[in-house]
Design a protein with these regions (language model features):
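Short, solvent-exposed loop/turn segments at secondary-structure boundaries
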Residues: 128-132
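Short acidic (Asp/Glu) and glycine-rich catalytic loops that position anionic groups and cofactors
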Residues: 26-32, 120, 168-172
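Accessory terminal regions of nucleic-acid processing enzymes
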Residues: 20, 27, 45-48, 56-57, ...
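An active-site-proximal "capping" alpha-helix that borders the catalytic cofactor pocket
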Residues: 134-146
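Metal-dependent nuclease catalytic regions and adjoining charged, substrate-binding loops involved
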Residues: 1, 5-6, 146-221
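Metal-dependent nuclease catalytic cores that hydrolyze phosphodiester bonds in DNA/RNA
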Residues: 1-109, 113
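Active-site ExK catalytic segment of metal-dependent nucleases
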Residues: 103-109, 115-124, 137
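Short small-residue beta-strand/loop micro-motif enriched in glycine and branched aliphatics
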Residues: 32-34, 124-127
């Protein structure tokens, strides 16, 4: 039986469309590539540098002042460098040989427990359900940490940045929203289980909302 290499982003395709997920892993048929905006990647880089400067000073950044006295920034720089890497990240392999890895943005530490912190850049203020789109990703990160022997809290944080205004000197100001969400390890386990089951079965039906499958069906007439 073939084994597979998963990541939170590749597993998100399972929810979007089981057929596209099956084709991607079993037939190496991928969605057409599109231009990826560079701004989120640039923001991610400068935010990590910003947080690392605060970590070296042993202080929390202004965006996390509401957590003062409760947590500190994870300060194992070498380990954090590995866990942030898209080529390494936090890894785990199941007994069948299926491999999953994920690259985190940052970690907070509360006593002996870790708390995953992820940065998100948006163009607009949050909606009521914005954080729900990232629950699977955060559950998988926590699952991986626990599989590697680290205790994590039963919650995680998303730190959202969205543009607010441009000052007279040209500096762009961002508002921030810190959102605390509950961790569900069982959800991560179920995602992995379903992923393997789908890939080991026949090609599934496409999602009704999948624009790629709709496009293909129209091409085929």
């Amino acid at each position: 039986m073939p084994t597979h290499k998963f990541s939170p982003s590749s597993l998100s395709l399972l929810k979007d469309c089981p057929r596209c997920f099956w084709l991607y892993f079993n037939k190496n048929i991928k969605h057409p590539t599109t231009a990826f905006p560079s701004l989120p990647s640039g923001m991610d880089k400068v935010l990590k540098e910003h947080f690392d400067r605060c970590m070296k000073k042993r202080e929390l950044p202004p965006e996390l002042t509401q957590l003062n006295g409760e947590v500190k920034l994870f300060d194992n720089e070498e380990l954090l460098k590995v866990w942030r890497s898209n080529f390494k990240g936090i890894q785990w392999t199941d007994k069948s040989g299926n491999h999953i890895h994920g690259a985190i943005d940052n970690l907070l530490q509360k006593g002996k427990k870790l708390i995953v912190l992820d940065y998100k850049t948006r163009g607009f203020p949050l909606k009521e359900d914005t954080h729900e789109h990232y629950k699977d990703q955060m559950d998988i990160y926590n699952f991986l940490l626990r599989k590697n022997g680290y205790d994590t809290e039963d919650y995680t944080y998303l730190l959202f940045y969205h543009p607010h205004r441009v000052e007279e000197n040209g500096h762009v100001c961002f508002n921030t929203d810190l959102v605390k969400i509950k961790v569900n390890i069982t959800n991560a386990e179920n995602i992995l289980k379903k992923a393997v089951e789908v890939l080991e079965g026949d090609m599934p039906h496409s999602s009704k909302e999948c624009g790629f499958c709709e496009w293909k069906s129209k091409l085929n007439g």
